[in-house]
Amino acid sequence: EDMGAEPLPVVNCGLACQYQNDSPEANVPIDQLDSYIQDALDLIEFANGDISTTWGKVRAEMGHPEPFHLKFLAIGNEQWGEEYIVRLEPFVKAIRKQYPEIKIVGTSGPGSEGEEFEYLWPEMKRIKVDLVDEHFYRPENWFLKSGNRYDLYDRKGPKVFAGEYACHGRGKKWNHFEAALLEAAFLTGVERNADVVEMATYAPLLAHVEGWQWRPDLIWFDNLKSVRTCSWYVQSLYGNNKGTNVIPITLNKKAVSGQADQNGLFASAVWDGTNNEYIVKVVNTSQEAQPIQIAFEGLKKSVKMDGDGKQIIFHSDNPDAENNLEQPFAIVPKESTIEVKGNQINTTVGAQTFVVYKVRK
């Protein structure tokens, strides 16, 4: 609440972690799921229920009489196979009956493709979950080739929740600049397909340098200091410049998603109705600087955009460089003005650079 965040709890569906133990004996039998389902229902009542309800009263007694306005509930994390489906269905049935306003999140398993992924997506559609949680921890080449991943997703199916993702990069599992750059490139496709991808969250947020369980992570810390990684800045540049409406942006009459004739360029564009400005994100993943022209077309004849816009440039000469506790600000975005003339921006995007352009209407 202090951060303006909203809750999205993930509840146990009666399956053990299938990575750790895929034996049927480790799972809750179907006819013994009732207590797990009731836990999920009680959680919703605790979060949203009136203080006259059993769990709403508990919440009030704990010092929070106002509801938490829970909107989403995920059932299971990185589960797969028929054993997941037969447990998910009774959860969905019970929640739909008692709390039809809650959006239910299912999962497509631990991978971004493959047998389990291909099995689970049709099942998620059949069961009619609201969102499907996709996870992908992948190397650089995967992110470079996945800028158009969501272009052909079914617009009528469940929405996507990209619930965990990160670019590992060259066998490393920390946040060097090139990994962050390719995450920025991938996110242009996420933003362009906002009608399909409802939410996205990066890999774990916080990790202690001497006590971590998983990497990469967005923020590293020791007992005295903390450091924001390159990936953190990418997330910040997207989160603080997300706009209110997606607008089309093309190169050679195609989406700018690193296609064969686009020289490693990726781009997305939004209109921010709150601040009355256009926001264009451009990522140059190539090894060479590239001249570009951003032309704002289809505007009313009375609209003339001339003057100064803003550009926020995120770049490192060394793709393997990173921010660390000793040099926490080695790589940070830099803001400056850029000329807008005749509804156009003519500029050059540096090699391996992520730029956010902001132009007021």
Name each region found by the language model.
Residues 1-15, 55:
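Active-site-adjacent substrate/metal-binding segments within catalytic domains
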Residues 2-6, 66, 98, 189-197, ...:
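A structural motif corresponding to the C-terminal end of an alpha-helix
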Residues 9-13, 77, 106-108, 201:
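Glycine-rich, histidine-containing beta strand-loop boundary motifs that form or position
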Residues 14-18, 157-267, 274-276:
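Aromatic/acidic polysaccharide-binding cleft in carbohydrate-active enzymes
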Residues 15-31:
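Surface-exposed, active-site-proximal loop segments in enzymatic domains
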Residues 42, 46-57, 61-192:
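Active-site neighborhood of glycoside hydrolase catalytic domains
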Residues 254-262, 284-361:
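C-terminal beta-sandwich/jelly-roll accessory domains of carbohydrate-active enzymes
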Residues 277-285:
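Short, well-ordered beta-strand segments enriched in hydrophobic/aromatic residues
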